Regions:
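Short linear recognition/processing motifs and adjacent strand/loop elements at protein termini
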Residues: 2-8, 15-113
């Protein structure tokens, strides 16, 4: 019985998705903005941008959004929104116009990844 219980606990920890949550939008001194999300662990991320309508799309695989996100912000960011379905979290950054942007990075902090 203990072996079965141990196996089920191990299996449930393996099945548990990587939880992701919105953290902050921060303006930098060099007229750029940084949008941060927190992850439990490192994930595969695919990102791309669209010109019309102007937006940046970030897909975080094997993840589950803690709660829906819809954050309005100042120029050039119109709205940051996110949702999850089937272990995929999609983050969409709606923009007033096309901007130069950098691919997302993952950094370890005290709060998570």
């Amino acid at each position: 019985m203990n072996k079965i219980l141990s196996f089920l606990l191990l299996l449930s920890s393996l099945v548990h998705s990587n939880e992701i949550s919105f953290y902050e939008i921060k303006d930098s001194d060099d007229q750029s903005s940084e949008i941060s999300f927190l992850l439990d662990k490192v994930s595969f991320i695919k990102s791309y941008s669209l010109v019309d309508p102007s937006r940046i799309v970030i897909d975080v695989y094997q993840s589950d959004l803690k709660s829906g996100v819809e954050e309005k912000y100042n120029y050039p960011i119109k709205l940051v929104r996110a949702s999850s379905k089937d272990d995929l979290t999609r983050i969409v950054i709606d923009l007033y116009e096309y901007v130069n942007w950098s691919k997302p990075t993952q950094e370890k902090t005290d709060e998570g990844i």
